[in-house]
């Protein structure tokens, strides 16, 4: 096997726009700044926007003229 062919795997700091900071390991040689993390993403926080199915149907009917 060849030696010294794998990239260095180092600890980096990841900073989210919400202020959450955590450490992880990566081959990236610099710290990361991200927009969303598990602390602020709607899927993980449970603050998802519920889409009204009735509103979507009315929008479809208005756009394509289908009405009953």
UniProtKB/Swiss-Prot annotation:
Keywords: Metal-binding, Ribonucleoprotein, Ribosomal protein, RNA-binding, rRNA-binding, Zinc. InterPro entries: Ribosomal_bL28/bL31-like_sf, Ribosomal_bL31, Ribosomal_bL31_A, Ribosomal_bL31_sf. Binds 1 zinc ion per subunit. Its cofactor is Zn(2+). Zn(2+) binds at residues 16, 18, 37, 40. One of its GO terms (cellular component) is ribonucleoprotein complex. It holds the Pfam family Ribosomal_L31. Binds the 23S rRNA. This is Large ribosomal subunit protein bL31. The gene is rpmE.
């Amino acid at each position: 096997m060849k030696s010294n062919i794998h990239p260095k795997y180092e600890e980096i700091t990841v900073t989210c726009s919400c202020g959450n900071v955590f450490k992880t390991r990566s081959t990236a040689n610099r710290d990361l700044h991200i927009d969303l993390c598990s602390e602020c993403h709607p899927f993980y926080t449970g603050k998802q926007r519920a889409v009204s199915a009735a509103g979507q149907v009315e929008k479809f009917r208005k756009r394509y003229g289908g009405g009953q």
